[in-house]
Amino acid sequence: MKLMDNKNIKKLTLLAIWTALTFVLGRLFTFPIPGSAGNILTLLDVGIYTAVFLFGKREAAIIGGFAAFLLDLTAGFSNYMFFSLIIHGGQGYLAGLTRYKWLNFLLSLLVMVGGYFIVGGLMYGWGSAIAGLWVNIVQVIVGFVLAKVLSPLIERTGILNGFRKA
């Protein structure tokens, strides 16, 4: 009995590579924000939004959740890692939920910014959570814009030939 065919292995491999690339992108460009008790500005969202544009919502949820989890684990924010798994996983899923890109963007922004606002408020107080709102809003907007630019360029290279968006 064949457990996995070549198509599934190729898809799993591609998702693992994209998760690693998203993690590395986020880890290399991580900037702690003073006075915001745990907020960081990172380019992780570029990988999440690029994943949703290239692969689909389920794949982006997996990539976003695991890459964010690994980022927090290795960057000294382990108190956030399980929250990040859920928040960025939800962000990736909602970014591809409907056929309306503006609605998807708004939903994904709300889950990411709102999720970290609640977690930050419970961990460090609501004043700190309010102070960190702008960081997450900027991170989402920059991630979305860069992904909109990068996704067509990546598609044109042909490296994703044979992979169908779900």
Curated annotation (Swiss-Prot):
Keyword annotations for this protein, in alphabetical order, are:
Cell membrane, Membrane, Transmembrane, Transmembrane helix, Transport
Q: Show the InterPro entries listed in the entry.
A: ECF_substrate-spec-like
Subcellular localization(s) per the UniProt record: Cell membrane
Q: What's one GO-annotated cellular component? A: plasma membrane
Indicate how the chain sits in the lipid bilayer: Multi-pass membrane protein
Residues spanning the membrane:
14-34, 35-55, 62-82, 105-125, 126-146
Which Pfam families does its entry note?
A: ECF-ribofla_trS
Instruction: Outline the subunit composition.
Output: In E.coli forms a stable energy-coupling factor (ECF) transporter complex composed of 2 membrane-embedded substrate-binding protein (S component), 2 ATP-binding proteins (A and A' components) and 2 transmembrane proteins (T component), probably with a stoichiometry of 2:1:1:2. May be able to interact with more than 1 S component at a time.
| Functional description taken from the UniProt entry | Probably a thiamine precursor-binding protein that interacts with the energy-coupling factor (ECF) ABC-transporter complex. Unlike classic ABC transporters this ECF transporter provides the energy necessary to transport a number of different substrates. The substrates themselves are bound by transmembrane, not extracytoplasmic soluble proteins.
Q: What is this protein called?
A: Thiamine precursor transporter HmpT
Tell me the lineage of the source organism. Bacteria, Bacillati, Bacillota, Bacilli, Lactobacillales
